[in-house]
């Protein structure tokens, strides 16, 4: 066998679907964790400066943000490790299915690992779908604030409300308790918040974090299809003495 044929045979064992999913997963997790971490820090500062004068009112928010920072560290570490494991499993199953190294060979342990990877990937897909929905919440809150600021800076002709009565109350979102003071920002104060670099940066970071979570969901969907297909073929070929290739 020549060098060219050997290279073609080796390239045939590359799990391109798993490789694409791994790159997409790493990118999505990096965007979600990195942008989410910085955005949460900016949220804490905005609340302390403009919505809560008493430190005891936002102490719970501070603790929650600190806890979410640690959760982000754990999610990033686990996702990167699991992505590498799935990529390695993809190389194993692709080589076995395509019989790269001779006739079809697999073990009960190998099929068990493939089945477990399918199960875990489905669970992670559902979990990340929830994370994607959850990450859209702060982006929605920021969009409401931005829309209110746009109304203040460029009021429509048919506006009947006084500019100073246009407010955003973060207490209704559960960010701080109802007895927090002032708890809301109105008129010129709200415009000042929207013009700060913290608001602009955190708004865009939350959008990017949401997009990163969406990319991770897509990556896990690709993983689901690849691992399910590989597991089905392994199970089929281990039971039947056939030469059919899908």
From Swiss-Prot:
Q: Does the keyword Transmembrane helix apply?
A: yes
Q: What is its main location?
A: membrane
Write the record's keywords in alphabetical order, separated by commas. Membrane, Transmembrane, Transmembrane helix
According to Swiss-Prot or TrEMBL, what is its membrane topology?
A: Multi-pass membrane protein
Single GO MF descriptor: structural constituent of myelin sheath
Tissue specificity, per the record, is:
Highly expressed in white matter in myelinating shark brain.
A single Gene Ontology CC annotation of this entry is: membrane raft
Q: Which InterPro entries match?
A: Myelin_PLP, Myelin_PLP_CS
> Where would you find this protein in the cell?
Membrane
**Any transmembrane segments, and where?**
19-35, 71-87, 118-134, 206-222
Pfam hit, one: Myelin_PLP
Q: Which GO terms describe its biological process?
A: axon development; central nervous system myelination; negative regulation of serotonin uptake
Protein family:
Belongs to the myelin proteolipid protein family.
* Name of the molecule in the record: Proteolipid protein DM gamma
Instruction: Specify the species.
Output: Squalus acanthias (Spiny dogfish)
């Amino acid at each position: 066998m020549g060098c060219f044929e050997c290279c073609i045979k080796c390239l045939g064992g590359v799990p391109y679907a798993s490789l694409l999913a791994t790159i997409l997963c790493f990118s999505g997790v990096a965007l979600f964790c990195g942008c989410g971490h910085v955005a949460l820090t900016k949220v804490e500062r905005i609340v302390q400066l403009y919505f809560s004068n008493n430190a005891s009112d936002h102490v719970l928010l501070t603790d929650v943000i600190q806890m979410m920072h640690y959760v982000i560290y754990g999610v990033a570490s686990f996702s990167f490790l699991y992505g590498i494991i799935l990529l390695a499993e993809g190389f194993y199953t692709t080589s076995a299915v395509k019989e790269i190294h001779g006739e079809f060979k697999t073990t009960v342990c190998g099929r068990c690992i493939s089945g477990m990877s399918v199960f875990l990937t489905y669970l992670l897909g559902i979990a990340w779908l929830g994370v994607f929905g959850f990450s859209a919440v702060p982006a929605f809150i920021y969009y409401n604030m931005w829309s209110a600021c746009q109304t203040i800076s460029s009021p429509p002709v048919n506006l009947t409300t006084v500019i100073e009565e246009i407010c955003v109350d973060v207490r209704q979102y559960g960010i701080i308790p109802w007895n927090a003071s002032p708890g809301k920002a109105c008129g010129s104060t709200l415009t000042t918040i929207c013009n700060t670099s913290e608001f602009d940066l955190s708004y865009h970071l939350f959008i990017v974090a949401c997009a990163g979570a969406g990319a991770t969901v897509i990556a896990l969907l690709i993983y689901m299809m690849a691992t399910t297909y590989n597991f089905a073929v392994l199970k089929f070929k281990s039971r039947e003495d056939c030469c059919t290739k899908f």
